[in-house]
Every structure is written in structure tokens, then in C-alpha cells.
Amino acid sequence: IKSVVRPSFTSDFRLALGFARSRSVIVGIIAITVIVDMWATPIRSIIPVIGEDDLGLSPLLVGVLVSSQGVGSLIGAALIAFRGDPAKYGRIYFYGSFLYLIPALLFSLSNWFVLSLPLVFIGGLGLAAFSTTQGALILMATPPEMRSRMLGLLAVGIGIGPIGILNIGLMATLFGPSRAVMIVSIEGIVALAFAAVVWPMLRRGEDISPS
């Protein structure tokens, strides 16, 4: 029986990085994932604090506020699953990221529950658009023999999330929770605008297949 020699982790990782660099669209997908997980998704951890401290909500209404994002995400994911066109996943992914951050910025400026609630709900729709298409885009842009490696790189990008939580926690300590959400939202929007220039194929909805 012949033994199978498996490549080392470092050589496998270098191979994955080399392939990703050769495909600009993959770099763009992972870059937007890093942006969202650094500056967007950590905002969820501050919503209850804003609800209680800045909006003066009861525990029940704080729960309603936080859960509205989950409702938005559920509806958004269902719409994409049953009505989404894979040819438009690039646009859904890109603009969904904005659809999370822009309502988050407006939420940081709101003093009323009746305004904050739909903003958090809309953010949930954006989060669903982002999260349900990122893995699919990697698969669509990668040949079968490289898909597992590219999904691994995507997971590395997602792993930046805890750093984002530490960042927004520091901002909240220094400037208060609402101001922290405003700061990180603006940072994320600026970063996404930069990504729109560097990787325009996603916002344009271009064909990203490896052929």
C-alpha cells in the first residue's frame, strides 16, 4: 500500500495565498468580509447597551430591539434563498454590507425607539445579504480543487471579529456607546467605499466564474 504524502500546513497555506492573489475577486470578497467583521458585526454587541442607557428602554423593549435584527436577518435570508439570483450575488453581498452599516450609523444618532427599531431591522436585512452570499461567492469564483482552501481563507477573514469587538468596546469606553457605533460605522463605510474602487467587479455584478 502506497502512503499518501500530504502537504504541510505552511506549504498549503502559501498555495492558498498564491491562488487568492491571482484572483482579484477572491481578494475582494475576503477583504469585504474583513471589513464587515471588523466594523459592522461587532455593533450587535452594543445595541442592548444603547437601548438601556441612551434610549431608556425597559428590559422587554431592549429584547424587542435586539431581536428585530434577527427577524430582519431571517426574512432577508429567506428572500435570498427563494428569490435570489446567483448572478446577482456579488451585488447583494456588496450592497448588503452597506445596508448594515448605514442604518447602524443612523441608529447611533437616534433618540427614539420607534425610529431605532426599523433601523435595526433593516440592518438585519443587510446582514443576511452579506452572510448568506459570502461563502457562495467563494465557491462560484474558485475551481473545485481550490474551494476548501479558499473557504479556509474566508474563515480566517471572519476570525477578525473578536478584534472588532475589542475595538468597539474601547470606543464605547472612551466616547460612550452611541458615539462608538457612529465611529465604527463611519470607518466601515469609508473602508467599503475604498473596496468599491479597488474591486469594482462585485458592485457591478460581473461574472466571477474561474473560467
Residue ranges and their predicted role:
Residues 1-31:
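Juxtamembrane intracellular "pre-TM" segments in multi-pass secondary transporters
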Residues 12-14, 21, 35, 47-211:
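C-terminal transmembrane bundle of multi-pass solute transporters/carriers
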Residues 29-30, 38-50:
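Short helix-kink/termination motifs in transmembrane helices of multi-pass secondary transporters
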